Regions:
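Glycine/aspartate-rich loop-and-adjacent alpha/beta segment that forms the canonical ThDP
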Residues: 123, 128-180
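Short acidic, glycine/serine/threonine-rich loops at helix termini
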Residues: 14, 64-66, 92-96, 152-157
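Short coil/turn segments at beta-strand junctions that form active-site/ligand-binding loops
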Residues: 47-50, 78, 137-139
């Protein structure tokens, strides 16, 4: 089903098909802005609601992301958690080659986020970061250091697998390698 038209995992999340996805977005950073709006709306309405958004480090080259992050801190959205998949790669190459993000942890801290840096492949670390106490008045950022395609020999660290679906033989090999 991955990367096939009309499937639940056709590419970018489709809120009409994927349970738990509240907005259909692409790779242009809209998700963070939508999440900020949802978190702010919940605050204004007095709702005890937590909002989570997942970003790729490559999309953090979009200006809209930084405007959303500034707004989250400005409005003291302590009901917002931003998770950044920090794998260093995007569709066109490495982030360093395309446009360096510089010191991402420092940027998130300066923007007013309560930052948790983790190994994004460590489920215990993910659970601990998600469950860490909220700092009143500060949004939370989880910078998850990952390797694209981790655990699959022909995918690991390879830009070409950004949005490509494996054929049946590759799928079987990937599943075997992940099980081992």
């Amino acid at each position: 089903n991955f990367r096939q038209l009309h499937s639940i995992l056709q590419g970018h999340p489709d809120c009409k098909k994927v349970p738990g996805v509240d907005a259909s977005t692409g790779s242009l950073g809209q998700g963070c802005s939508i999440a900020v709006g949802m978190a702010l709306g919940a605050k204004v309405q007095g709702k005890d609601t937590k909002v989570f958004t997942l970003l790729g480090d490559g999309e953090c080259q979009e200006g809209q992301i930084w405007e959303a992050l500034m707004s989250a801190a400005h409005y003291k959205l302590d009901n917002l958690t931003v998770i950044v998949d920090n794998n260093g790669l995007q569709i066109d190459g490495s982030n360093e080659e395309v446009m360096s993000l510089g010191d991402m942890p420092a940027k998130l801290r300066v923007f007013g986020f309560d930052l948790h840096e983790i190994d994004g492949h460590d489920l215990d670390a993910i659970e601990a970061a998600l469950g860490a106490p909220v700092t009143p008045g500060r949004p939370k950022a989880i910078l998850a250091h990952t390797v694209k395609g981790k655990g699959v020999s022909f995918m690991e660290g390879q830009v070409g697998w950004h949005g490509k679906a494996p054929n049946e033989e590759q799928r079987q090999q990937a599943l075997k390698e992940l099980e081992d």
